Amino acid sequence: MKKIQMITPIVEMDGDEMTRILWKMIKDELILPFVDLKTEYYDLGLVNRDNTGDQVTIDSANAAKKYGVAVKCATITPNAKRMTEYKLHQMWKSPNGTIRSMMDGTVFRTPITIPSIHPAVKFWKKPITIARHAYGDVYKSIDIKVDEPGVAKLIFEGESGKREEQVVHTFKGPGVLQGMHNTDASIRSFAHACFKYALDLKQSIWFATKDTISKKYDGRFREIFEEVFEEYKDRFAAAGIEYFYTLIDDAVARVMRSEGGFIWACKNYDGDVMSDMVSTAFGSLAMMTSVLVSPDGKYEYEAAHGTVTRHYYKYLAGEETSTNPIATIFAWSGAFRKRGEMDSIPELMNYADQLEAACFDTLNEGIVTKDLANLMEGVTPVVKNSADFIAAIRSRLEKRLS
């Protein structure tokens, strides 16, 4: 079989633990036999991030901005335990957070659904896409642990000399405080990305904050969304879709009673939480796509889940693992499809379609990893380990491409 040729490289960001093992399996079994793969490789494994002072993360984000399409493996965001385990020089920030910030992107996460796995929420008939603002708020916050009485103040000193000062709290004893921010430019980019994506998918978009409580902070999000929507209003009407704003608590109640089939735009923290809730309710976090989209049309694809640490320790102990690779495979297929679209390579786009179809063929025949076995209805599942599951996908992919 002649391999599909590429023109422009995809930026490849390798990762950590069990997903790093799956990454190599996927490349060896599902990509390299069919595609003359061109990537610009960056090792974002925690050891290399530590060795490079996290410069590799910055370099990979710049490469994504240069080439326009990236695919990323799941990575560890270190905590105190990981500091000790990996003997780190410092507690490095989330690589996802760094990349999102540098690309000023919006994260869109959509469940991968199959007929035999029914959502836990009985009303849901169609996938719900979470649009997560990927900049600022608590992820760019500053924390202080207070150990004595005192006054906490919020101060802004403008370049013009203007000064604003407000008392946050007068502490009578120990406590904690936090300062966070966002920018009009980033919120505006988020709004544009959401409305453009809604038009691409021809789906309505819901947006929710808590502007009744956070009148200036969350209120600014609402104001900017309403301003930006004026530019899209006519196109939304022509497409038969709508923009709907409500409070975040009301949005949760409405989402739980809905049929799905829309985009739910969320602030950074809300999107982080709700994407996990939506993916789990639809079946599994291992069955969810994630794509970071920048305002100037750069894309970074990844799985929505983490590094699957528990399975990795089993793997290191020589035990068999049944880790679900679907979301990671779909990260690659998404990157190939977008690269093919940008470079006008229909063969690469078709390969991406057939790779995803081969995954669905495998799952619909009841061949699954352990996490999906108890979720399936109407099909007798046959549980495979990771390697055998990927091999089953390969055999179906070969048939589709022959």
Q: Model features per residue range: what roles?
A:
Residues M6-M25, E29, L154-T246:
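Glycine-rich phosphate/diphosphate-binding loop of Rossmann-like nucleotide-binding domains
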Residues K2-T8, M18, L22-W23, D28-G53, ...:
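N-terminal alpha-helical transmembrane segments of multi-pass membrane transport
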Residues V47-R163, Y269-V273:
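N-terminal glycine-rich phosphate/adenylate-binding segment common to multiple enzyme folds
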Residues L46-S60, R222-F262, C266:
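N-terminal small/polar loop signature for handling phosphorylated ligands or for N-terminal nucleophile
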Residues A317-T323, E341-S402:
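Internal helix-turn-beta structural module
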Residues V255-Q354, D361-E365:
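Glycine-rich phosphate/nucleotide-binding loop
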Residues V35-Y41, L201-T209, K233-Y245, G340-A352, ...:
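Flexible, glycine/charged-enriched surface loops at secondary-structure junctions
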